[in-house]
Amino acid sequence: FACNSSPRFTNVPVSFVCLGQSFTFNHGVTDPDGDSLVYSLVNPMRNSTDSIPFVSGYSATNPITSVPALSINTANGDISMTPTQVEVGVLSVLIKEYRNGVLVGSVVRDMEVYVRMCNNNLPSESGINGTNIRDRTICPGTLICFDIMSNDVDSSQLVTMTWNQGITGATFSVSGTPHPTGNFCWTSPTAVVGTQVFSFIVTVRDDACPNSGFQTYSYNISVRSPINALSLTPISCNGAADGSATVVVSNPPGTYTYAWTPGGQTTQTISAQGPGSDTVFVTDTATG
């Protein structure tokens, strides 16, 4: 695809994972072109054409013995597992790039995972403002700020919090000890066509010896351009019901669905049914 930049990895592939502990990792992928990224697990490749087969009981989507089963979030790339067996596994992550719903490129990254016994509890971090939510949708030109909290069951350990500077122009300040809080702030760009996703990752790491424990999570902000216009045809006279309203969406071009309330109409245009107010929800079928 002409004029396409490949996704970039900002996090080192994980090496060691603790037996019996819930663990989340993210490669910290950024895309210079702002393309939409979709993640999946695939077979590792021996060369450009041949994949490496797994032994019985294992597969590309089940490379590590884990309860619940190892999983990858297809939207943000978070890999989650709770290993139940000391072993070594290989994960291959395929990242596909989409631009306006069209596949423009892909890249694969392998990582080797060693599951071992640990005498240390991994640190953890919250979602946005202490919740479990790590995704937000905002309009262009909007200021968004939120906190991310860290924690560690081993209360005597010192936890550090870092981010990968994944969003240009954003700030991330860390304060507090031994379990710091990170504050993220950013004003979204005003020139956004359709929906563009901006992502960053945050890593929390303790000071356990001889090997520190860590986890990495992704945070994703979708910037979605608003509806361009609403075309109205006024009623011809007082008491008439011959007016209409039409939703006009031209940025970006695409296929949309419509849901009006009250009334339940699903057309782009509705005719006046009498006095009152109407609300319309517009959904881009390509991005949801």
Role assignments for model-derived ranges:
Residues F1-G34, V102-V153, S212-T233:
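Extracellular interdomain linkers/hinges and stalk-like, low-complexity segments
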Residues V88-R99, Q196-D207:
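A short beta-strand micro-motif common to beta-rich folds, especially ectodomain repeats
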